[in-house]
Amino acid sequence: MKTYLKFLSRNKLYTAIEFVGLSVALAFVIISFCYVVQQYAVTRENPDRERIYAVGENKNMINCYGMKEVFDGKLPEVEAVSHFQFVQDQLIHVGEQNFVGTLLVCDVEFFDMFSVTLKEGAPGMLSECNAAFISEKLAKKLNEASAEQPLIIQDDTLHIVGVIADKGSSLLPDFDVMMNYEHAQSYAIQSYRDNPFNHWANIGTFIKVRPDVDREELGEKLQALCDVQFSNSPTMEELSMVRFDELFFASAYTGLQKGDRSMLRTMIVIGLLLLVSALLNYINLNVALVGKRAKEMASRRLVGAQKSDIVWKFLGEAFVFTLFSFVVGLAIAYALTPTVNQLLQSDVAISIPFSLPYLVAYLLIVIVVSLLAGILPAAIIAKAQPIDVVRGTFRFRNRTVLSKVFIVVQNVIAIVLIALVLTMELQMHHMEDRPTGLNVENLYFLGSDLDYTDEKEAFVEELRALPCVKELASAQSIPGVMSMRFGLKKLHETEPKTYVPILNCDTVAFRMFGFEVKERFGDTDAHSFWITETTVAGMTGLPYGDNNFDTIKMWENHTIGNTVCGVIADFKMQDALHVTDEDYVLVYGNGGWNPDSHLLIEVAGDHREAKRAIDAVYKKHCEKVFGIYMEPEFDDFVDNVIAKQYDKHRRQMRLIELIMAVSVILSLLGLVAMSTHFASEREKTIAIRKVFGGTMQSEIRRNLKEYIIMILSANVIAIPVAVWLCKRYLEDFAYRIDLHPWIFVVTVALSFVIAIGSVLWQIVSVARVNPVMALKKE
């Protein structure tokens, strides 16, 4: 080991490049490994995961309150049925303390479906009248005086009977209070109980079945029960079932924590690509430097060492080097984890644990990486015969195309990532600049819990008095943002209904948005609605202008009294992420002021000053009503609200950009190291060529040509891969850019600039060497 350390100290540049590259790559491998393990751990948190199913309609796992009644006690295969819902942004009063948190309303059977650990109390205590469990996090916030006081949420006064332990990675979202449906007194819950099958809400229904129940047969029996219950109702169509261990990555809406399978695959690929790039640097440099250790290994062979001894020595050195790199990589990963979590915004945050199972896994990673890193250099040096080293012929034999192949592979990775990042940036700007087809300039959208209080009138009047407010209207949604959707039956087809977004606003907001009226059928009233040109064609099967109708079936077998008052020009109601074959929209824009709707404010002057003024008024009235500041659901200018929809994609793009930068740096370091090695190896050759008439310029061109050929080869391989990958990326967007050739022209140009810039200085320095001084060294 002493000779190895001495060798590293004599080759500081190569050592630094290998160590930095491998440490950074291993940091991302560690992050990716923890991300993958912790995501999949969520799917396995319940030991009965293969016996529990979420049920819903058309892959939408939310139901009406009465869905539990449909299944409970009806089938011998079903052991338990539970229903529950999460209600966010609830004002919680405990004594003199106020909190804003999430309420979980459920039944006792909830404990059969989810792994919930109680620090205090027992599951059966939830059946007690007005009982509540609180989270460990909330319990820590309560002072001694509040701990014995009742807990008040809306119309419910509860007494605390237990504490739920804080969980790590889990399918359940964080919640602060758990209470029983049977004892809830709020208006919404009472309306569910009074009309259990009329209110479709964000309620999950889970069933637990006996072991070895056939899934298909169970689904048929559950569907039959639903057909009987909803035979005269249009609200229930095809039943869907998702097993517990499938929920986390399911495409269906569940109301629970969600995993991103696409990002999971991306993180795996990212970790592997960076590891491959760093390993190529390590292997390439060690193979190139084998000649510098040839005499040492020849001497060992001459004094009795076997080939296997040499191989094990190299593998041992690789293990030590990888172990130190891993320790540094672990520190880098620990430091980077908050940044990566912020970029990913995953429901299950990444952590870097140091428990025994993880330490064993880390050790296995070190062993595998060290084997991959050390086996090739070990095999090459072990094949060398001592006599070849003594004669000086070994260094000529070890020059193969391997180093060039590694450089090409490294640059292929970097080039593909550069093209992908350019495409992602262009697509992001394309979405942000997408016109909605309506006026959204200087419009501010404010939606909060004040919308449902008696304080709203005073709040609105104070807003009207602000100098920055020109006009104020009510609107339940805005264009360019996904909104409430209704089922709409096509008049010319027998197929299932189409789900159509609704924009509901008053006449003032209708004018603010600047809808273009194509045709008015008659007088408007609060119960009539506008329909877009595309919706006319889609619903009737005839182009706009070839039909005449005044009613639309909102539900199969049911005709509502609302009438079509006219046709408006098409506009963008959905965001750019959702792929749809049809772009239907209904607009209720004829009603008067709706006190339960959100606020649409037209402002004048500086946007930042206007936002500060509006926020100050909101905070004042919010604290007056609730005693605490409650974050509004919407609180920004309409164009900013639209742009915020793409925050997730923007953050993921920043992560890919970070990976791209690391990959390019690794590639650059590899080129610098190899150009330095090749320059020192070719110093004598260049000197001889200059003696026989070569010039500095000719030697620069000759040596640079070799790197240009390598980068050109990398581009030939990388560009088709990049084109395919970029096309796949863009397929996820309904509103997307064309994949222009200039993107790849810029990518190729950048790859050449990076490559030439990283090797040119070494080529120039060796080409300027005095031939006399170079030949003296020989």
Q: For the regions a protein language model found, what residue spans apply to each?
A:
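Mid-to-C-terminal secondary-structure elements
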Residues: 107-119, 132-258, 461, 465-644
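Membrane-proximal extracellular/periplasmic loop immediately following the first transmembrane helix
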Residues: 32-91, 95-97, 104-107, 198-210, ...
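C-terminal transmembrane helical bundles of large multi-pass transporters
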Residues: 627-711, 715, 728-729
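Membrane-helix entry/capping segments
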Residues: 6, 10-11, 46, 224-271, ...
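Hydrophobic alpha-helical transmembrane segments of multi-pass inner-membrane transport and secretion
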Residues: 10-39, 259-295, 322-323, 402-427, ...
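Generic structural signal for small/hydrophobic residues in well-ordered secondary structure
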Residues: 8, 18, 28, 32, ...
